[in-house]
Amino acid sequence: MRKFTFRLWAVLMLMLVSLQTMATDTFTSNRTDFRDESIYFMMTTRFYDGDTGNNVLCWDNQSEQIKTKDPCWRGDFQGVIDKLDYIKALGFTAIWITPVVQNASGYDYHGYHAMDFQHVDCRYQSSDGSKDGDAMFQELIDKAHEKGIKIILDIVLNHTGNFGEQTLCKEFDRNTDLATQALINACMIPNEEKLGSDYLTSVPYEQYQRRLGLLKNVRGKNEDVHNYWHHFGDFNWDFPNRWWAQIAGDCVDLNTENDYVADYLVKCYGSFIKMGVDGFRIDTSGHISRLTFCKQFIPQFTALGKQYEDKRLNKAPFFMYGEVCARYSDVTYRGQDNLSCYYYTWQAPQELLDKWDGSQKYWDTQVLFDKANGGTGVDDHQMALCESDNAPTPTSDNTFMVNGKWHEPDYSQASGFHVIDFPLHYNFGNAAAAYGLAKSGDNRYNDATYNVVYVDSHDYGPQQTNDQFRFSGDDAQWAENLSLMFTFRGIPCLYYGSEVGFRRGAPIDRGPHGPLSETGRAYFGGYLTGDVEAKDFGDYTATGNVAATLNHDVAQHLIRLNKIRQAVPALRKGQWTDDGCTPADGGIAFKRAYKNDSYALVAINGGATFTDCPDGTYTDVVTGKTYTGSTITVDAPATQGQLRVLVKDWKGGQIGEDGPFIYNETPKS
């Protein structure tokens, strides 16, 4: 009898494992909706050094780089390739990498100071010279796809660096020999006809003024005769004139309202779509008007995505999301719709699009100077047209369940462009604040289930006491935020190292004023030495430091959350409501539904009571317990990050093992 009972138990366990394996296989092969993804965000040069021979010092702050043995250009594409299994072991299905195009500035390891949009930076080439940066990037895309991982490329449309741009205004020839890259005068050969024969002997300030003058008309004469750059001077971060202004010395504002400029950018970045990148994260989107996006970029990139869909993993639709920076605690940025994140998710009015005139013929009639040089920096038509795009947006129930059910969303007014959820990010000092903001503001987005959600990044942390620092919360606070991110609406995104609290509370960026090792952009490679092999998302074997990294409490929490999210379509793509949800102990509770196929009840930081639940059997994928009835009460310890996910008609049993934050009755480290 004992043998029979044991055999029956073994068969049942095998059936449960088989059902979960089938669900995983279905998820892996059917990821054609980007909401299926979870994103790991890295600064490529700071992640992992896979080719030590191509390390390069930035031009500025070289003494600190040498002293700390930490060249800014340290991580590389080979390093990402080598650690794809690490990212897969964590359960992440997509990688967002910082910009790859050729850069030029004193501190350009991050990639946001372009001098040539047509080529991958030469500092990404292999050290033996056999593969240039373009070839190495193609290899990364291909290797990632082989692992079932998508690549999101960070791109910049808003600006160049201040060393010109090789097509729009060529100021330098670039020597791409790797050995010359740490020496500015060895790798940057000035165009003396444009910059003067005494350029190299001039003081740095004079060199900068000469370079900038060719782009910005700041020397009292019209040097940018075709208006490839904007010429607006003083601006206010809180006014639409932020669309026309140079936001930093190394960020020279491109005239994206000029068709020639926009077409050139589309052509350059289109080559990466052709290579097979799966999506774009678009930098400084909030410094470009919505009208410009809807006219110049979104339709064009969407068409290119369709043209080259065979290059992408699973032929999924090309995905784009933008950084509409809104360092503000409310969903509407300082009372202004057209500067708010949600505004960009809606299509611009057709009557304004029809008035567009970005032709070179028009722009060649405009001679523009900023106020300091006797002008206004404002053209006769285009800028005013963009600023007239300021009508209040509609509201939408695309994010929400209606009458307790999923409903077909209405995308007839959608722009096709999605956003980083800056309001949630800014409120992620704790999960309750972020969730509360979503309750009041999700109707402003066309569909907030497409928002990319993170706690902190390479630019800002949440507004704790100062957003210039990486999130300073302890592991339990991380667990709480992550439990919400991976079960609530939106696409979860994690900044590299957060899985172990890396550089917790550190200043995010100090520029060339001190070593990178003391900032939130420190080198992470020491945590990744050793070997890791991922058989599937969240299923791995590892040795060395990388094994210890993966075994960190927060990393293990992430692995389980990724598994739960991947198993339940409602958590990835579902609409939500808190109707009929009463959390216990000050926690959070909501319902998620996707079509007629997936329905889940979620409780965070404790238990909850759910009413008006559809008939069926609900299985808590955290504990394996089952519930029935239209009113369901689930108990759970009232601890940070605690989670219950009751899935209707679920057949697979418990997902993952108890840990320090998610568990049945007793935490396990």
Predicted regions and their residues:
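Substrate-binding/active-site clefts of carbohydrate-active enzymes
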Residues: 31-37, 45-275, 297-307, 318-333, ...
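Bacterial N-terminal signal peptides that target proteins for export
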Residues: 1-9
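Boundary at the C-terminal end of the N-terminal hydrophobic targeting segment
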Residues: 21-23
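Active-site clefts of carbohydrate-active enzymes
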Residues: 250, 448-471
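Structural recognition of the beta-strand scaffold that forms the well-ordered cores
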Residues: 38-43, 93-99, 113-119, 150-154, ...
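Active-site-proximal helices and loops of the catalytic beta/alpha 8
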Residues: 141, 159, 191, 267-274, ...
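C-terminal beta-strand-rich structural cap/linker in extracellular carbohydrate-active enzymes
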Residues: 38, 629-668
